[in-house]
Design a protein with these regions (language model features):
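Sec-dependent signal peptide recognition
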Residues: 2-9
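C-terminal motif of bacterial Sec signal peptides marking the signal peptidase cleavage site
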Residues: 14-17
Length: 138
């Protein structure tokens, strides 16, 4: 009898584990992704990397500005009342807009844009990548 119960429990455990292939809807985790601590942590990581890489103040200002602008531009489609910075900043052209019916988690897209721009700016890309992966896992 004990072996039957044990076998049944193993079967149920495997069955439920294999049955959880549900695709997440962006609206389910959008609220969690809008947590400002993710952006603050990303900027703090950028500061740590700049201190480690020893960058001059003019370069540091660009290291902050470009990723933040990238993050803002990725977030603008979710806020129609906000205006894109394209045409207002020297050399910034219009960013391609997503389809109207696209299911996108804009805060996550914003973080992805931030990390992509940040990695392009610094020497210690791996430090930025590790921080990004930690945020994506939460």
């Amino acid at each position: 009898m004990k072996s039957f119960i044990f076998s049944l429990s193993i079967f149920l455990l495997i069955f439920t584990a294999c049955n959880s292939n549900k695709v997440a809807d962006p609206t389910e985790y959008k609220e969690k992704a809008y947590n400002a601590k993710h952006v603050h942590g990303a900027v703090e990581r950028m500061t740590d990397v700049m201190v480690h890489d020893i960058v001059s103040p003019p370069v540091a200002s660009r290291f902050y500005a470009y990723p933040i602008i990238s993050a803002y531009e990725a977030l603008v489609p979710d806020f129609p009342q906000q205006q894109s910075l394209a045409g207002q900043l020297n050399g910034l052209e219009a960013v391609p807009q997503p389809a109207k019916d696209a299911k996108i988690c804009y805060p996550l897209a914003s973080l992805q844009a931030y990390f992509k721009a940040a990695k392009a700016m610094v020497f210690s890309e791996d430090s930025i990548q590790v921080h990004a992966e930690n945020i994506y896992e939460t």
